[in-house]
Regions:
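Hydrophobic anchor at the beta1->P-loop junction of P-loop NTPases
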Residues: 3-5
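P-loop (Walker A) phosphate-binding loop of NTP-binding proteins
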Residues: 8, 20
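Walker A/P-loop
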Residues: 14
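ATP-dependent small-molecule kinase phosphotransfer cores
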Residues: 32-101
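ATP-dependent NMP and nucleoside kinases share a basic, alpha-helical "lid"
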Residues: 93-97, 102-138
Length: 145
């Protein structure tokens, strides 16, 4: 069974994922996969550079340059997501077990990245905003301000 898990920061996704993992489930953390691909996937970086010239220098993504472009232009962000979501989905497909077993895909863009289609069931983890704020403050060592 493949479970797709999504939800906002501080909702409890990590707790759910830890429970699945302790029961022998495979956890596919799409954020970690994305960051690994930024360091290893030359094809993805090449596609980003082709669409957003000057954002990859010596094989390294220049996050500030790219962020300045995509966060100022919704269409540019959609195009970046198309590139990166495709690469992440490809990697998830490579890591999914060929034999039936419990696996969970943890992805903020579960639906946007078309990963939900790989799942037998999807779960949106939610929590009251007050609880989320308290959890984030405790986790990150920050104040509410």
């Amino acid at each position: 069974m493949i479970i797709g898990i999504t939800g906002g920061s501080g909702c409890g996704k990590t707790t759910l994922l830890q429970t699945i993992e302790t029961r022998g489930g495979l956890i596919l953390d799409c954020d970690a996969i994305y960051h690994r691909l930024l360091a290893t996937d030359a094809a993805m970086l090449s596609a980003i550079e082709a669409r957003f010239p000057g954002t990859v220098e010596d094989g390294v993504l220049q996050r500030k340059k790219l962020g300045a472009i995509v966060f100022a232009d919704e269409q540019a962000l959609l195009e970046l997501n198309r590139i990166t979501h495709g690469a992440v989905k490809k990697e998830v497909l490579c890591q999914l077990p060929t034999q039936p077993m419990l696996a969970a895909i943890d992805a903020i863009g579960l639906f946007e990245g078309e990963l939900a289609a790989l799942c037998d069931v999807t779960v949106a983890v939610t929590a009251p905003m007050e609880d989320r704020v308290q959890r984030l403050m405790a986790r990150d060592g920050i104040t509410e301000e």
